[in-house]
Regions:
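Alpha-helical and His/Cys-centered functional microenvironments
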Residues: 9-10, 24, 200
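Bacterial N-terminal signal peptides
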Residues: 14-28
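His-enriched metal-coordination microenvironments in redox/metal-binding proteins
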Residues: 143-433, 440-441, 451
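N-terminal secretory signal peptides that target proteins for export/translocation
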Residues: 1-13
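Aromatic- and Gly/Pro-enriched helix-to-coil junctions and flexible linker segments
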Residues: 29-175, 183, 187, 196, ...
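Long, low-complexity, intrinsically disordered segments
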Residues: 446-452
């Protein structure tokens, strides 16, 4: 039903192209010389693009065109003007009144006004001497040059149409000693057919897919209902890929651990888009130069027990995670599918104080973003990370695959998920198991309450 639905890259293409067509009637721009007092590309616009746009808008990345040079940017100025005025680009969905984030890619009003004024004046190029030095990007990577690259053992054939079940493949690292990973990036070779990829670390002796042979693609039955508990998988979430999700580069002194003899388990969700292609995803790792002072672990608050009624416009689902040891909360990542409407993270401290740290009032499932806290939060034992999400299963949701369906947890786009991922920073002498709740408590979804 929804196998042709494409995510992130298509979302970017549709946004940009629709905006471009929308401005065709305004193509009679001023002369390229423009107003003498108008902003210029080299002096005023290029620095904004370097800071906020070029990580995606450059050759080989997810965006459909490059913004590295004036010549590459100039044909798209009309679309740019509308996109920044409507705050469609760069993609950023956090409520500006709640929380502050180190990776906030949204434009300030001054930056928006600069781009709008530049386009209105005819997009003058300006003095080449004003052009800032090119940003330093590693070709083919969003991380520093990888120390190790691990790749799928062979290409996977993604068909022209139909549904592709989640694909898994185990790739041995060959590490003979423990490695501390300071930066990691997953790069598919065919981004347009990838819904998401997760690279898990499977330690020696783990029961996680213990009967599967390395180097061979296989499918796994999806978790259901009370068995859905990604906070307690017998593997470690290393890094993920989804449209709009940048590479993971941890601060100095922090790293994720990959033990000697570990394997990487790739989970790949392909979505056919009308063209048969071959994908051979790779994973780049950059190692810390010395043992870190802090270890980083990706965990989650998750609820897989919900049943969203047909037509419900505002169904509420809650999940929480209780802290056992003192940790630092560094970043958060809400995850839902097409019916996702809004998402909120709160911290409830042992004394009862509640603090809202992220509110996404208009969730956009095409963009799977991490939000890095500008000031990480120390969480004492007994604190809780609480997540609340609402889903719109009504006909008024243009993304809804089928408003007549009762929706439960599932892996495909037409199913739903409710996961609040987060990165915890902690003493490396602790085990990840020390962070997990002592007793599994399955979150219960609450009935829909309009307006809540």
């Amino acid at each position: 039903m929804n196998s042709s639905r494409r995510r992130g890259l298509d979302a970017m293409n549709r946004t940009v192209l629709s905006l471009l067509f929308a401005v065709c009637s305004t193509a009679h721009l001023s002369s390229q010389m423009g107003n003498m007092n108008a902003p210029t590309f080299t002096k005023d616009v290029a620095p904004i693009l370097q800071k906020n746009c070029q990580s995606c808008h450059r050759p080989g990345e997810a965006a459909p065109f490059s913004m590295l040079t004036y010549e590459e940017t100039r044909p798209w100025t009309g679309a740019m003007k509308l996109a920044v005025k409507q705050k469609l680009m760069p993609p950023w969905f956090a409520d500006p009144q709640v929380g502050h984030f180190a990776n906030d890619r949204s434009l300030s009003q001054k930056e928006i006004d600069t781009i709008v004024a530049w386009v209105t004046a005819g997009a003058p190029k300006g003095d080449p001497k004003d052009m800032p030095a090119p940003a330093n990007f590693v070709e083919g990577w969003g991380i520093p040059k990888p120390d190790v690259i691990l790749q799928l053992p062979k290409e996977f054939p993604v068909p022209e149409s139909g549904m592709v079940e989640y694909q898994y493949v185990i790739v041995p690292t060959g590490f003979t000693e423990d490695k501390w990973v300071q930066a990691a990036e997953v790069r598919p070779t065919e981004r347009s057919v990838v819904h998401h990829i997760i690279a898990y670390v499977r330690e020696p002796g783990s029961n996680y897919f213990k009967d599967q042979k390395p180097g061979v693609f296989f499918e796994a039955p999806p978790a259901k209902d009370e068995n859905v508990d990604t906070s307690a998988l017998p593997s470690d979430f290393l890094v993920g890929y989804a449209p709009g999700q940048p590479a993971e580069v941890l601060p100095a002194g922090e790293a994720k651990l990959v033990k000697a003899g570990s394997d990487i388990v790739f989970e790949v969700h392909y979505t056919p888009n009308g063209k048969a292609v071959m994908d051979r995803t790779k994973l780049g790792l950059v190692f810390a130069k010395e043992p870190p002072k802090k270890r980083v672990q990706t965990l989650s608050a998750v609820n897989g027990t919900f049943k969203i009624p047909p037509g419900d416009p505002n169904y509420r689902v809650d999940a929480s995670f209780e802290i056992r040891k003192e940790v630092i909360l560094a970043s958060i990542h809400p995850h839902m599918h097409a019916r996702g409407k809004d998402f909120e993270y709160r911290i409830v401290f042992p004394g009862g104080e509640t603090r809202t740290i992220l509110r996404v009032p208009q969730y956009n499932w095409h963009w799977q973003l991490w939000y890095n806290l500008d000031e990480p939060i120390v969480l004492p034992p007994g604190a809780r990370i609480e997540c609340t999400a609402h889903f719109d299963n009504s006909p008024n949701n243009p993304e809804n695959p089928d408003p007549t369906k009762t929706v439960i947890w599932g892996q495909q786009n037409w199913d739903e998920m409710m996961v609040g991922f987060f990165n915890l920073v902690y003493d490396p002498r602790l085990s990840p198991k020390d962070l997990l709740p002592e007793k599994k408590e399955v979150a219960k979804s609450k009935a829909s309450v309009a307006g809540k």
